[in-house]
Amino acid sequence: MTTTIRSGRLSGWESFCNWVTSTNNRIYVGWFGVLMVPTLLAAAICFTIAFIAAPPVDIDGIREPVAGSFLYGNNIISGAVVPSSNAIGLHFYPIWEAASVDEWLYNGGPYQLVVFHFLIGICCWLGRQWELSYRLGMRPWICVAYSAPLSAAFAVFLIYPVGQGSFSDGMPLGISGTFNFMLVFQAEHNILMHPFHMIGVAGMFGGSLFSAMHGSLVTSSLIRETTETESQNYGYKFGQEEETYNIVAAHGYFGRLIFQYASFNNSRSLHFFLAAWPVICIWITSLGISTMAFNLNGFNFNQSVLDAQGRVVPTWADVLNRSNLGMEVMHERNAHNFPLDLAAAESTPVALIAPAIG
């Protein structure tokens, strides 16, 4: 009989595995983190370089490049990483697919590099949240809550461009680019009249309201552990078992302010509601973006309201329709991209004499 005694020294691979999965590290790495770190670094580095120095991009595919970087006259507000060209469409466009680096830059290759690495990175961040919760014996609801902004990012950076047929329709990576995306989205899909967007607004504003209400109620019903001359914050010790506020007092106040059943008498159900309300609403909004990506748009009221004599009764819907058309015209300023809902109508003369050119 042969007995094998294993050496106490670990191999390099075993040491690496122990380090990756250790919860004693100052910052937990995890197996998802092994992929998250390089992808997010690649996205951040490419974004920074492109924001500073990228040349203009032929976003519409019509040889009219749009500049988005600092070196081409933009500032922190107007700057953006411009989406890849409409000539590329939905083709995967890594740097080795272009004939040269100049061509790759001209067609907006950095946008795809940033977006794809970013999406992989934030998926790994979600997985890392679950992994750390699992190793600490916690429930997985933190990563479930994070899935709400994750779904929103996938909706605007991947699902919407796929539905529209080109990554040039993706959201530009910049402040003014984000607002431009919002205006164009409203013009083409009437998102303000989509019920899923309305639910998202209720989630955002409602979540902010509920958060402020909860914080103010807790702060107003703290159990005093300090003197008048000390900060109330010193009355709490990290890890203490005792409640730091009186939930009975908060429940009684809010129940009398509105009505009894508007107030939670269970701290766990209260905090679940505070997490679930905005998360579910953002999920629904992301679903709305994903459906509008395939042109299942918001409600439209293109037919004006008429009175008994056939006269148009002006409504807010008419104002909204005109603003949508105006935004669409400004966005698609070239004749061959002219909005179909305007081009299909009878031409209306706006000048009696054609202006002389030159």
UniProtKB/Swiss-Prot annotation:
A quinone binds at residues 214, 263-264. The record marks 343-344 as: Cleavage. Chlorophyll a PD1 binds at residue 197. GO terms for cellular component: photosystem II; plasma membrane-derived thylakoid membrane. One of its GO terms (biological process) is response to herbicide. The keyword Coiled coil does not apply. Cyanobacteria usually contain more than 2 copies of the psbA gene. This is Photosystem II protein D1. It comes from Prochlorococcus marinus (strain MIT 9313). The gene is psbA1.
